[in-house]
Amino acid sequence: MADTSQKPDKATSAAQARQVIDVFHEISTLLNAELDRGTLSICISLIENGINPEALATVVRELKKDADEVRRQIAEGGVRNGE
């Protein structure tokens, strides 16, 4: 019979995962990174699966820059096709 006494149950694992995300979210907030818990969770999963953290950071910065530009264009009267 397998010894399951050392394996955390799903509820414990989920609680630990939430704690990790909460800590990363707090760090993100302190650094003004503006990353929500869902985004942080995705980033952590990508890094755990071998994505280069520096490359991921570059992509996140570029996406944020693009989103800011779209918001600026919308505020100025809308986004035009091809721009």
Swiss-Prot record:
Tagged with keyword Cytoplasm: yes
Function: Required for gamma-tubulin complex recruitment to the microtubule organizing center (MTOC).
Domain of life: Eukaryota
UniProt keyword list: Cytoplasm, Cytoskeleton
Principal location: cytoplasm
Annotated family: Belongs to the MOZART1 family.
Protein name, as recorded: Mitotic-spindle organizing protein 1
Taxonomic source organism: Botryotinia fuckeliana (strain B05.10)
GO annotation terms (biological process): gamma-tubulin complex localization; microtubule nucleation by interphase microtubule organizing center; mitotic spindle assembly
Cellular component, GO, one term: spindle
InterPro entries: MZT1
Subunit structure: Part of the gamma-tubulin complex.
Keyword set includes Transcription: no
Subcellular location: Cytoplasm, Cytoskeleton, Microtubule organizing center, Spindle pole body
